[in-house]
Amino acid sequence: REGYYNGMLFHRVIKDFMIQTGDPDSKSARPGMVLGANDIGYTLKAEIVPKYFHKRGVLAAAREADNINPERSSSGSHFYIVQGRIFTPDIIDEEIEKINNKRYTALFNRLQQACEGEILKYQLANDYEKLMQLNEKLSDTTRLLFDQVKLKLTGEQRAAYTTIGGSPHLDGEYTVFGEVIEGMEI
């Protein structure tokens, strides 16, 4: 609603990354008060659109972590502005490789967790052949599904990250809904 953010503090500021606001308690915060835990009381459906990415100046909705919020629903009030950093072409390639390695491992771990009971059964029976077969099946499934979560930069993303900067590790993970058009030099 109009005026909601008037007088609200940016409670989370991380150099070369982002600044975040949205905690209504920040309007009456005392010095030293820990902020960031409260919000407006509702979430919004995720609207993650690949053409909107985390270049410098983008506004995006904050949210709880995937383990708590697998649907990636956005906070109804918390948002952040990307500060980010500028990457050289070589460094952006290294960053994308690191991001994709993490995403691959996370996907494999989720699939493995879904088979926890089966794994335990084979372990208790000392059935190492079945464990190896299951591991191969999980690895194959991970490779097949990975293409859906793999970060692939477009030419526009690569140009932005190597000129104005940003935070590519957030791409495909959060709802981007706006962009600062002037005033980022503050």
Task: Give names to the regions the model predicted.
Residues R1-I186:
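Cyclophilin-like peptidyl-prolyl cis-trans isomerases
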